[in-house]
């Protein structure tokens, strides 16, 4: 009888330890660097591969646009954050930064830094305060006016039929002439993805 009780207790303790081991807190403890250019669809959300595809297409089109390619000197552009017209949370700041950075690297366009206007105004006041030596003072009136506004929006359409899901993204970007208000350059990039709903196994 004592042997049976000991055996039962041993089994119970084993089960308890097993449950605690399975249900306890877990953490990612080992990692490695991955290739950022590799496309890997882990879920049905917008990802960095989608963003890169769109940015590459937009940049190539804007640089090839005749108003940019044939300009006597690089046009000056001010960029507005890309609008998110989807129901998904997408980092539009990163999208906008990626496009602007790639365009600057082409040396075909220049950008004025709109977000830093407040900081620049503070620096002008500081330069005029008398603590900065004359030859190194930076004065108002020398900033370059923008020739174009670069703006755009992301839209999406989702279709689900049974276990099948299709997601369609479209990014449209325009370069608007500051003087004439005409859209001189425009491009859109479409990304369509298919997913199949499957049972999640433990």
Name each model feature, range by range.
Residues 83, 115, 179:
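Short, flexible active-site-adjacent loop segments at beta-strand->alpha-helix junctions, enriched
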Residues 130-131, 197-202:
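Short, surface-exposed secondary-structure junctions/capping segments
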Residues 1-20:
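Sec-dependent bacterial lipoprotein signal peptides
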């Amino acid at each position: 009888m004592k042997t049976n009780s000991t055996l039962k207790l041993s089994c119970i303790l084993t089960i308890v330890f097993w449950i605690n081991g399975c249900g306890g807190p877990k953490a990612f403890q080992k990692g490695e660097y991955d290739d950022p250019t590799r496309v890997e669809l882990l879920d049905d959300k917008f990802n960095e591969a989608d963003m890169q595809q769109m940015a590459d297409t937009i940049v190539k089109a804007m640089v090839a646009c005749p108003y940019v390619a044939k300009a006597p000197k690089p046009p000056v552009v001010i960029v507005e954050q890309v609008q998110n017209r989807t129901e998904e949370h997408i980092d539009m700041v990163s999208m906008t930064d990626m496009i602007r950075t790639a365009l600057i690297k082409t040396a075909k366009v220049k950008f004025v830094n709109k977000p830093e206007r407040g900081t620049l105004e503070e620096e002008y006041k500081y330069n005029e305060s008398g603590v900065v030596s004359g030859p190194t003072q930076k004065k108002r009136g020398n900033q370059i006016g923008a020739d174009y506004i670069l703006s755009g929006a992301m839209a999406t359409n989702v279709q689900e039929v049974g276990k099948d899901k299709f997601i369609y993204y479209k990014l449209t970007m325009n370069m608007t002439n500051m003087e004439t208000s005409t859209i001189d350059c425009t491009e859109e990039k479409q990304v369509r993805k298919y997913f199949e709903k499957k049972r999640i196994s433990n």
